[in-house]
Regions:
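Active-site-proximal alpha-helix that buttresses catalytic centers in soluble enzyme cores
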Residues: 1-136
Length: 136
């Protein structure tokens, strides 16, 4: 049987947020991150789709540094409901297949200045499991 400590040495949590320019948003997400870490014991980072830092790719780098034997990242969108961000943007930013066709750009070729075109690629060789939005 695998112990919780063994799992903590191989699995980390990525909480994914849209991002905001409002300073209290970062404070709120750091509080959520700290509560999640305390409740689960797993290394936890917040990654932002846009506007705020760290980016999703940057948060993955932070997790890789914190958990040297990292094999799996469980990504949890901190959104109230599923939608374009949780079904298309976040999977794409994580290097996963979108869960549906993007009605904004059905061919998947985004303009050069679109955030999905300019975002950093996630550099992770392990598994990434994307859970549904954390909302109700």
């Amino acid at each position: 049987m695998v112990s919780n400590l063994e799992l903590q040495n191989k699995i980390a949590i990525l909480l994914v947020s849209h991002g905001s320019s409002l300073p209290f948003a970062e404070v709120t997400f750091n509080e959520i991150k700290d509560k999640f870490n305390k409740a689960t014991g797993f290394a936890t980072e917040v990654g932002y789709m846009k506007v705020a830092e760290p980016s999703i790719a940057g948060a993955v780098e932070n997790l890789k540094e914190e958990v040297p034997e990292l094999e799996k990242i469980i990504a949890i969108p901190v959104f109230l409901a599923p939608g374009i961000h949780t079904n298309i943007d976040i999977p794409t930013l994580l290097g996963l297949s979108p869960l549906e066709t993007d009605p904004r750009c059905p061919d998947g070729n985004y303009p050069d200045d679109h955030y999905l075109s300019i975002a950093e690629d996630v550099d992770f060789d392990g598994d990434i499991e994307l859970l549904p939005a954390i909302g109700p």
